[in-house]
Amino acid sequence: MRALIVVMDSVGIGGAPDAAGYGDEGADTVGHIAEACAAGQADSDQRQGPLQLPHLAALGLGEACEHATGRRPPGLQQKAGAGAAFGCASERSRGKDTPSGHWEIAGVPVPFEWGYFPKTVPAFPPDLIDQLCASAGLTGILGNRHASGTDIISDLGEAHLQTGQPICYTSADSVFQIAAHEEAFGLDRLYRLCEATRPLVDRFNIGRVIARPFVGRSASGFRRTANRRDYAVPPPEPTILDLATAERRHVVTIGKIADIFAHRGTGHNLKGDSNDTLFTRMLEGLDALDDGGLLFANFIDFDTLYGHRRDVAGYASALEAFDARLPELLDALRDDDLLVITADHGCDPSWSGSDHTRERVPVLIVNGRSAGSIGARTSFADTGATIAQHLQLPPTRHGNSFWPNGA
């Protein structure tokens, strides 16, 4: 009896009741990708035609979309299989960011408002930058504005190589991001700089400091590497990871999960440089997962490579590639395992700007027993509550099990 949470990062399905308050009314990541594919607007060298997600559809993705928005996207008309359990969930936390979504999935909605840096130039208070430069021995910084990570590296990467000054920027999320060249600036030096920055931004209630290393020699050749590292504040209450760890359960985390939870209760962490590699790491982790254990995985490419970059065709291709590997995961499950596939927020690649979008998320469940609709859940925390129930852990403080009387 084991439990798995698989987060398809940013794979929202629209319909959030409070989306208008975020400027996201009508945003629908999966729905708009499916519509673009059906209209021939997402054809590329990697994929063509309607969106093909037969295995996610068999788990109830079409029904989950219908729960969220009242309609099924084109290409997801296939009915869920007889053993599928499915629904959607709304976020209770105020943010539409990575920590808020993941913490709530793990049973802890964020009870406060994150701090954000203003969309001004400069974006950061002068005294913060003075402290940062003094603590790290810097002559100054570059950037100091809201920006897309790939764009600002292209814009300022050459100046960074010339001056040795790191590129500091933010976004609509509660983040302070630092980009630097892995070789010229040094990866370890970048990590130390981020570690020094973490306490400096605490007074602004900033969720994450993010190291964004890159390589290349000119604007046309700069590219970010897989050595990103997030320095997050820890969750304000015990999560399902903490509960499992306290009970001496085997915990395996995949991808950036350990960073998101500030390495608290995250057990053995396996990393990879792509969704495909992460999927392989997940299968390895599952193969080694003890009875009573918890595996928590994040698949980041949907968000970072395609959502933020507003690449509809790339996002569609990534969804189809993930779907094609799903049978490997399903075949590796034991009869008494519980699998929940969900998302942490949306990032509609057809939407304006480059930020996350406030959306409901799918909740697709495989547990070998209960099937059918779990409806539209009012909190992501219901997933954490259900995992705790399944693993016979102490109950989470927030959320309600999908099956109050047991699966």
UniProtKB/Swiss-Prot annotation:
The gene is deoB. Its cofactor is Mn(2+). It is found in: Cytoplasm. It comes from Bradyrhizobium sp. (strain ORS 278). Isomerase that catalyzes the conversion of deoxy-ribose 1-phosphate (dRib-1-P) and ribose 1-phosphate (Rib-1-P) to deoxy-ribose 5-phosphate (dRib-5-P) and ribose 5-phosphate (Rib-5-P), respectively. Mn(2+) 1 binds at D9, D344, H345. Binds 2 manganese ions. It holds the Pfam family Metalloenzyme. This is Phosphopentomutase. It catalyses: 2-deoxy-alpha-D-ribose 1-phosphate = 2-deoxy-D-ribose 5-phosphate; alpha-D-ribose 1-phosphate = D-ribose 5-phosphate. Pathway: Carbohydrate degradation; 2-deoxy-D-ribose 1-phosphate degradation; D-glyceraldehyde 3-phosphate and acetaldehyde from 2-deoxy-alpha-D-ribose 1-phosphate: step 1/2. One of its GO terms (molecular function) is phosphopentomutase activity. GO terms for biological process: 2-deoxyribose 1-phosphate catabolic process; 5-phosphoribose 1-diphosphate biosynthetic process; metabolic compound salvage; nucleotide metabolic process. GO terms for cellular component: cytosol. Keywords: Cytoplasm, Isomerase, Manganese, Metal-binding. Its EC number is 5.4.2.7. Belongs to the phosphopentomutase family. Mn(2+) 2 binds at D303, H308, H356. The keyword Metal-binding applies. InterPro entries: Alkaline_phosphatase_core_sf (IPR017850), DeoB (IPR010045), Metalloenzyme (IPR006124), Phosphopentomutase_DeoB_cap_sf (IPR024052).
